[in-house]
Amino acid sequence: MTRKGLDIVQGSAGVLIGAPTGVACSVCPGGITYANPVNPVLGAKVLPGETDLALPCPLPFILFRAYSSYRTRTPAPVGVFGPGWKAPFDIRLQIRDEGLILNDSGGRSIHFEPLFPGEISYSRSESLWLARGGVAAQHSSQPLSALWQVLPEDVRLSPHVYLATNSLQGPWWILSWPEPPAYRVLTVVVDGFGRSLTFHRAAEGDVAGAVTGVTDGAGRRFHMALSTQAQRAEASRKQRASSLSSPASPRSVSSSQVFPDTLPAGTEYGADNGIRLEAVWLTHDPAYPDEQPTAPLARYTYTAGGELRAVYDRSGTQVRGFTYDAEHAGRMVAHHYAG
């Protein structure tokens, strides 16, 4: 099945490896998800997308998490939820001399041949178009010619911008660059009416390149509170010191609770900079400019190894929990729901 919408998680249940272009490294992790504890086709643990945040509007920001223990040979860097997990804005396009590799929201790699400016390539197995900017308009014979015109002119004319869509009605996923020409990241989603969902990325500092804010189709603004491994380690040390100084607290702390200041630079799921999403805040709503929430809409905690440990809703209630193999970072061995 193909999921239409804001996330690129789709694909044929039997992609033929070796086809000329638009070829996935595996079958779709979001397809067959029964037969616990693993996907019977991939031989990997797969959890379909779980939605943590979705405020309705014409082009909403839907924050979901999808997990797969499948490891592609050409991975994107580890995302903000840690190894194995992907968020909708973790889509990345690798620009290589021999071709293009689209890392989707399911953790897969979809391979395309290089594109000339203005060229569009279609993957039949994935039902996905990948395009490159560089022309003001597409020829009328191109099925995406009408959808092309809803894009801002600067996007259409830039040969450095790539775009993807899985429908003739949109939306477009606009893949721009922080450091050309090595890769492109998701910066904007544009629907068939020209409305946009914008992902704001830090230009400098410890979290440079990461998404720190989102503006949805209604003009609502969200702040993505991020942390580095060093910051989590420092917070853990302060918490331990506070616990040990309290007469009512135990005098020993398990070594499993000790956070290292750094994480291994490379994992089976790709390079890991240690940046994680701690919380999501609604900071502006045009409909209620003077009434903003005093608590985050969602909050997350992590293990000492940077793996997603727990998810909390806006009431502070833990709604999900996860356990991982101590010998293999990111390999989930158990998960539970609230209650």
List each language-model region with its residue ranges.
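Intrinsically disordered, low-complexity segments enriched in small residues
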Residues: M1-T72
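Extended charged/polar low-complexity repeat regions
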Residues: G5-I17, F81-P83, E98-G339
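Nucleotide/phosphate-binding site architecture used for ATP/NTP-dependent chemistry
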Residues: Y34, V41-G43, I91-R92, R132, ...
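Short alpha-helical segments and helix-capping/turn motifs at coil-helix boundaries
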Residues: K45-E50, K86-P88, Q94-E98
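A structured, charge-rich N-terminal accessory region that forms the first stable segment of a protein
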Residues: L55-P56, L93-I95, S105
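N-terminal targeting and processing segments
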Residues: R65-A66, K86-D90, S123
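Short, polar loop/linker segments at the starts of domains and inter-domain junctions
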Residues: T72-K86
